[in-house]
Amino acid sequence: MNIVKTLDAKGLACPMPIVRTKKAIGTIQSGEVLEVLATDKGALNDFSAWAKSGGHTILEQTEESGVLKFYIQKA
């Protein structure tokens, strides 16, 4: 997986992780991967719905020590 950018959204409450992710995904090229770090449990559903609506692909999502990690490939 070729991660070109990492967004640290830890400690932010909904909707800020999505707002910042929208902005960050706009700075990368189609096919590139954005890594997003978040602690808001609502992000699990939010990112899934957001990626689907934008045509982006969540390649992987994991949780380590309370930190959710999303790897999103831009459409």
List each language-model region with its residue ranges.
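Hydrophobic residues in beta-strands and at strand termini
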Residues: A9, A38, I72-K74
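Amphipathic, hydrophobic secondary-structure cores in small proteins
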Residues: R20, A24-G54
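An N-terminal amphipathic alpha-helical segment
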Residues: M1-I28
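C-terminal structural segments of small proteins and small subunits
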Residues: S48-A75
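Intrinsic-disorder/low-complexity, polar/charged segments enriched in Ser/Thr/Lys/Arg/Asp/Glu/Gln
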Residues: T6, G31-E35, V67-K69
